[in-house]
Amino acid sequence: MPKMKTNKGAAKRFKKTAGGIKYKHATKRHILTKRTTKNKRQLRPNAILPRCEVAAVIRMLPYA
């Protein structure tokens, strides 16, 4: 059986850890002047993917 292909876009965005799948929050790149300090602070830490989306990401990352 041939090797399964990794979805390269997903590989750059998600990282599998013991606690789940880690990802970075969106809307934190540019044009941040209109965002409040509180909002920018809340987007700062990495987040764990919700359980309902884990299966789709695992399918894209067969060797993670």
Curated annotation (Swiss-Prot):
The keyword Ribosomal protein applies. Keywords: Ribonucleoprotein, Ribosomal protein. InterPro entries: Ribosomal_bL35 (IPR001706), Ribosomal_bL35-like (IPR021137), Ribosomal_bL35_CS (IPR018265), Ribosomal_bL35_sf (IPR037229). GO terms for biological process: translation. It comes from the Bacteria. Disulfide bonds: none annotated. One of its GO terms (molecular function) is structural constituent of ribosome. One of its GO terms (cellular component) is cytosolic large ribosomal subunit. Belongs to the bacterial ribosomal protein bL35 family. NCBIfam families: rpmI_bact. HAMAP family: Ribosomal_bL35. This is Large ribosomal subunit protein bL35. It comes from Vibrio parahaemolyticus serotype O3:K6 (strain RIMD 2210633). The lineage of its organism: Bacteria, Pseudomonadati, Pseudomonadota, Gammaproteobacteria, Vibrionales.
